[in-house]
Amino acid sequence: MTARIIDGKVIAADLRGQVAREVERVKRDHGLTPGLAVVLVGNDPASEVYVRSKHTQTQAAGMASFEHKLPADVAQSELLALIDKLNHDPSVHGILVQLPLPKGLETEIVINAIDPAKDVDGLHPHNAGRLSGGQPALAPCTPLGCIILSKTVHPSLEGLNAIVIGRSNLVGRPLVQLLLNENATVTIAHSRSRDLAALTARADLVYAAVGRPEMVKRDWIKPGATVIDVGINRIPTAEGKTRLVGDVAYAEVAEVAGAITPVPGGVGQMTVACLLVNTLRAACAIAGLPKPAV
């Protein structure tokens, strides 16, 4: 068996197209232009690349894009004042503070200062609480992308056995809640779980988000299972360079899985696309409009 490749690049492009069409519709029918504000603190090169990508894709979807760049030594009070200003700006429907923040800034305080209605990263405790209670909420973008990718293989996740390896607040925990809301049967595990291979071998859906290069092996996977690899790890090569791998030993797992996401080209492609989805949903909710068809 050779696994079907779940092409995140193609699926994300289709999702961005759906968002753009919905943005065009709400502009035409309601005079509403969704707006996303991204706050970048410091000059971390990787963060700058991510912010540029978000800006480009936001504009391509027909949304307004607002960038706010602050120095690494900015006072927390100044950052909080900017967030408060964005909270009250009617042209801004989504606020994203690029993480990680420089030392000296309290991430939890900063995230909690964002209006939950504009928290398009889905990290505010209000949204996390609603998600855990099965209520409508803005969900973190990476877990949301995992669900969308899964549904390209299984249009309904109801009744499927799923395992989430990883318990971070950014991916693992919210992914569990999203799966429960889809009526999947969910096991959450982590690097210290006992008999992890045996637990994983029972799952129809495997989500690897533990941050350990190629941890999930072939003999962990039930034949025909769907494997979603959230990991992004750089490992050295024999030539003294590095290469990007996930948390799944891709080549060997692809021989037994029914479907699998590659790294790169899988989950990572979905994150910004889902950010656009959340921004559109937030804009419609704030304006009192029905939930968009995406």
From Swiss-Prot:
Top-rank lineage group of the source organism: Bacteria
Reactions listed under catalytic activity: (6R)-5,10-methylene-5,6,7,8-tetrahydrofolate + NADP(+) = (6R)-5,10-methenyltetrahydrofolate + NADPH; (6R)-5,10-methenyltetrahydrofolate + H2O = (6R)-10-formyltetrahydrofolate + H(+)
GO biological process, one term: tetrahydrofolate interconversion
InterPro entries with a match to the protein in the record: Aminoacid_DH-like_N_sf (IPR046346), NAD(P)-bd_dom_sf (IPR036291), THF_DH/CycHdrlase (IPR000672), THF_DH/CycHdrlase_cat_dom (IPR020630), THF_DH/CycHdrlase_CS (IPR020867), THF_DH/CycHdrlase_NAD-bd_dom (IPR020631)
Binding site for NADP(+): G166, R167, S168, S191, I232
The protein's Enzyme Commission number: 1.5.1.5, 3.5.4.9
Coiled coil: none
SUPFAM superfamilies in UniProt: Aminoacid dehydrogenase-like, N-terminal domain (SSF53223), NAD(P)-binding Rossmann-fold domains (SSF51735)
UniProt pathway: One-carbon metabolism; tetrahydrofolate interconversion
One GO location term (cellular component): cytosol
GO MF entries: methenyltetrahydrofolate cyclohydrolase activity; methylenetetrahydrofolate dehydrogenase (NADP+) activity
Record's keyword terms, sorted: Amino-acid biosynthesis, Histidine biosynthesis, Hydrolase, Methionine biosynthesis, Multifunctional enzyme, NADP, One-carbon metabolism, Oxidoreductase, Purine biosynthesis
Pfam family of the protein (one): THF_DHG_CYH_C
NCBIfam families noted in UniProt: PRK14186.1, PRK14188.1
Known function: Catalyzes the oxidation of 5,10-methylenetetrahydrofolate to 5,10-methenyltetrahydrofolate and then the hydrolysis of 5,10-methenyltetrahydrofolate to 10-formyltetrahydrofolate.
Subunit-structure text: Homodimer.
Family: Belongs to the tetrahydrofolate dehydrogenase/cyclohydrolase family.
PANTHER family to which the protein is assigned, alphabetical: C-1-TETRAHYDROFOLATE SYNTHASE, CYTOPLASMIC, C-1-TETRAHYDROFOLATE SYNTHASE, CYTOPLASMIC-RELATED
Protein's UniProt name: Bifunctional protein FolD
Originating species: Bradyrhizobium sp. (strain BTAi1 / ATCC BAA-1182)
